């Protein structure tokens, strides 16, 4: 009997280690240099599909632009760090957490949302008159838009809105700047400016951040929470943390595509945010969009070492499971319940007319 036991005494630990090594090799092989057939498919796709061209173009900017150490230094010198960390420490201690817990970063992001919206940045439906001064925006009549002048062009300004003051008759320009460092100075804008600067702010604190673009003209952020071990929705316009349901449920917004852009990858995260009111997804075949995101992601990770690639791939797999399921049934029902009970249906930021035009007023 003892001899039989010896033969059947399988070393499961060794087998598990061997399988893990093989699995890791398999994962790494998926992120090695693209095969020629993949390159051909990618080139054909971006040459024949306008949506694919747009995703590629955005990735070339959004995946890298915020990783700028000199910008990070300027941001940290500009913000009131003493106030921010004082408030974080206060809330952290009040909830009974101990120093060193990795949930601290979640508290930091929540405070940055509060600080950015309530103390630092200003929503701008219409600008104040340059001649009459503060609190005069209601006197402004829009006259249309024009291109930037030489000075405005220095700060990546795409268009300039022109307004006339009904009181004094003077013209005021509202440049729509895309340079986040310039936005540190102007401290005003709409959702594009808010998300642009807030993404840089999160990056400046060393956080893993993604910029999320929605085809129906809204943008927001995600940051990877080490405590929750997943990507978390963050919207600075709404001071919203981990509320991915607010767009389709609270705002009643109709959406088709939501794409996340980060330094390590591009991901279609539509299923996280589009819980109802889904518009037709007819801009690109689903298998082509999946391939496109994976191809761009592979490019972004090409210079990483094997351990980094493997860790990110495991994180990807976990996220895909979450997206395929939508959310766990419990979490989803909690989200819908919380949204339906909210007394603040519809978007917070923006004028009533502007929100109604965009279909974001909850009606």
Swiss-Prot record:
Subcellular location, record wording: Cytoplasm; Nucleus
Key words of the record: Cytoplasm, Hydrolase, Metal-binding, Nucleus, Zinc
GO biological process: ERAD pathway; protein quality control for misfolded or incompletely synthesized proteins; ubiquitin-dependent glycoprotein ERAD pathway
Low complexity bias locations: 334-343
MF GO annotations: metal ion binding; peptide-N4-(N-acetyl-beta-glucosaminyl)asparagine amidase activity
Segments of this protein annotated with the region Disordered: 325-363
Function per UniProt: Specifically deglycosylates the denatured form of N-linked glycoproteins in the cytoplasm and assists their proteasome-mediated degradation. Cleaves the beta-aspartyl-glucosamine (GlcNAc) of the glycan and the amide side chain of Asn, converting Asn to Asp. Prefers proteins containing high-mannose over those bearing complex type oligosaccharides. Can recognize misfolded proteins in the endoplasmic reticulum that are exported to the cytosol to be destroyed and deglycosylate them, while it has no activity toward native proteins.
Other information: Present with 4850 molecules/cell in log phase SD medium.
Assembly notes: Interacts with RAD23 subunit of 26S proteasome.
Record protein name field: Peptide-N(4)-(N-acetyl-beta-glucosaminyl)asparagine amidase
Species name: Saccharomyces cerevisiae (strain ATCC 204508 / S288c) (Baker's yeast)
């Amino acid at each position: 009997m003892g001899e039989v036991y010896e033969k059947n005494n399988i070393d499961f630990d060794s087998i598990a280690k061997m399988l893990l090594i093989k699995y890791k090799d398999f994962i790494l092989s998926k992120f090695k240099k693209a095969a020629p057939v993949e390159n051909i498919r990618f080139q054909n796709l971006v040459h024949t599909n306008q949506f694919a061209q747009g995703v590629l173009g955005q990735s070339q900017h959004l995946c890298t632009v915020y990783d700028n150490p000199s910008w990070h230094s300027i941001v940290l010198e500009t913000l009131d760090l003493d106030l921010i960390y004082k408030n974080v420490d206060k809330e952290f201690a009040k909830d009974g957490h101990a120093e060193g817990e990795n949930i601290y970063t979640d508290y930091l992001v929540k405070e940055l949302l509060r600080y950015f919206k309530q103390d630092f940045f200003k929503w701008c439906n219409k600008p104040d008159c340059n001649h009459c001064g503060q609190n005069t925006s209601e006197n402004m009549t829009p006259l249309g838009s024009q291109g930037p002048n030489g000075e405005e062009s220095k700060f990546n300004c795409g268009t300039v809105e022109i307004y006339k003051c009904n009181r004094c008759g003077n013209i005021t320009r509202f440049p729509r700047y895309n340079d986040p460092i310039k936005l540190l100075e102007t401290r005003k804008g709409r959702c594009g400016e808010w998300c642009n600067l807030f993404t840089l702010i999160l990056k400046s604190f060393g956080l893993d951040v993604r910029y999320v673009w929605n085809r129906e003209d809204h943008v927001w952020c995600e940051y990877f929470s080490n405590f929750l071990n997943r990507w978390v929705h963050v919207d600075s316009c709404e001071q919203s943390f981990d509320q991915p349901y607010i767009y389709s449920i609270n705002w009643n917004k109709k959406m088709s595509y939501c794409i996340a852009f980060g330094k390590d990858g591009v991901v279609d995260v539509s299923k996280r945010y589009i819980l109802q009111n889904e518009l037709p997804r007819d801009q690109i075949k689903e298998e082509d969009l999946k391939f496109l995101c994976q191809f761009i992601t592979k490019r972004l990770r090409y210079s990483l070492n094997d351990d980094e690639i493997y860790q990110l791939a495991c994180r990807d797999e976990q996220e895909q499971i979450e997206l395929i399921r939508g959310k766990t049934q419990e979490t989803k029902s909690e989200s819908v319940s919380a949204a339906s009970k909210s007394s603040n249906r519809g978007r917070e930021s923006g004028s009533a007319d502007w929100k109604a035009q965009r279909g974001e007023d909850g009606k």
